[in-house]
């Protein structure tokens, strides 16, 4: 049975956007001073973005966050490409209000270039966004995900959505929901993370649900 969601804003993950994102760790290194970063941001057609603190809006309209000062040419940085924002329903809210002022935050995401939205919607609409992104990943990498597992409440608020895991020789690529880590902590990103494999031990087997949850959390939580 579909699970209700207050609102969803999203922008399709394309091959070009994915290519640019996956190339960041091996791109020419850009110094982490403001002048050098501003120059690289302008050269790429990016902009600084306030929806997530210290983030960028790429030329494809997605929001890119990193745990370092620069995402350019830093192989050990963890980077996150946000292509969807979910405002989940809180089933514990007896009046089902859930802080309706958060609609305005989702509106800001929906106003980004190339983004669209739906309200109300369901977890199935969110899964459709993730499935489209997964097809792009499969087309780009030439193979499907190594692991597919439902998300847990420890990783993201809202209904359980699908996490998919790929690996390159150096990085883990995790596609799925993640906490927005914003000032309210209630919205959920739909994102692709690119993080060094060293963030967690070897990928657990498919039947080790608890181990996979810990492994994914080590890569997507920041």
Show the residue positions of the predicted features.
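Active-site beta-strand termini and strand-to-loop segments that position acidic
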Residues: 165-170
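Short helix/turn-capping signatures at newly exposed starts of structured segments
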Residues: 1-151, 156-159, 179-222
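Short, isolated positions in well-ordered beta-strands
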Residues: 173-174
């Amino acid at each position: 049975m579909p699970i209700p969601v207050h609102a969803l804003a999203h922008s399709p993950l394309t091959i070009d956007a994915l290519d640019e994102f996956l190339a960041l760790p091996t791109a020419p290194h850009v110094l982490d001073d403001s002048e050098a970063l501003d120059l690289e941001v302008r050269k790429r057609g990016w902009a600084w973005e306030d929806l997530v603190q210290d983030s960028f809006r790429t030329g494809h309209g997605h929001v890119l966050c990193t745990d370092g000062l620069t995402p350019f040419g830093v192989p050990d940085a963890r980077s996150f490409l946000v292509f969807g924002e979910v405002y989940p329903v809180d089933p514990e809210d007896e009046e089902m209000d859930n802080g309706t002022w958060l609609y305005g935050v989702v509106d800001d995401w929906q106003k980004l270039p190339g983004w669209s939205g739906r309200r109300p919607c369901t977890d199935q609409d969110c899964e459709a966004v993730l499935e489209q992104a997964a097809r792009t990943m499969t087309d780009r990498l030439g193979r499907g995900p190594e692991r597919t597992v439902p998300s847990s409440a420890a990783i993201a608020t809202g209904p359980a959505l699908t996490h998919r895991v790929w690996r390159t020789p150096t990085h883990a690529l995790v596609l799925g929901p993640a906490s927005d880590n914003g000032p309210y902590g209630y919205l959920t990103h739909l994102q692709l993370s690119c993080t060094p494999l060293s963030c967690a031990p070897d990928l657990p087997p498919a039947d080790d649900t608890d181990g996979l949850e810990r492994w994914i959390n080590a890569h997507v939580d920041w």
